[in-house]
């Protein structure tokens, strides 16, 4: 999914750069670098948020997920086959903690 998003953004950037280049000459003081191709690190971090790796679940948290999943027979069987985290997410959505 990330690859598709990056590909689309690169395609749009290429289209914008080629269309502005073919539209006419730029003034001498307006180089592409000053035109916004690059940005400061703090501005870039506001646009692209870094995701952190998920932390390990504690034994109490895992047991809590197991108790919720035990009430649903299909979820309980999936937990035995694929793991409690995959089963909980499939039936109840994202893990709440």
Curated annotation (Swiss-Prot):
Residues that coordinate or bind Ca(2+) 3: 70, 76
UniProt-recorded Gene Ontology molecular function terms: calcium ion binding; hormone activity; hydroxyapatite binding; structural constituent of bone
Binding site for Ca(2+) 2: 67, 70
Domain Gla positions: 53-93
Tissue: In the branchial arches, BGP is found outside the chondrocyte-containing zone. It is found in some cells in the basal zone of the branchial filaments, near the branchial arches, and within the extracellular matrix in the medial zone. In the vertebra, BGP is found in the mineralized bone matrix.
Record PTM: Gamma-carboxyglutamate residues are formed by vitamin K dependent carboxylation by GGCX. These residues are essential for the binding of calcium.
Secretion signal span: 1-18
Family membership: Belongs to the osteocalcin/matrix Gla protein family.
Name used for this protein in its record: Osteocalcin
């Amino acid at each position: 999914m990330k690859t598709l998003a990056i590909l689309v953004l690169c395609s749009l950037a290429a289209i914008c750069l080629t269309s502005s280049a073919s539209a006419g000459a730029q003034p001498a003081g307006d180089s592409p670098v000053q035109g916004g191709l690059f940005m400061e690190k703090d501005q870039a971090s506001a646009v692209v948020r870094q995701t952190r790796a998920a932390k390990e679940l504690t034994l109490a948290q895992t047991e809590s997920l197991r108790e919720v999943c035990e009430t649903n027979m299909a979820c309980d069987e999936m937990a035995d086959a694929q793991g409690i985290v995959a089963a909980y997410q499939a039936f109840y959505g994202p893990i709440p903690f």
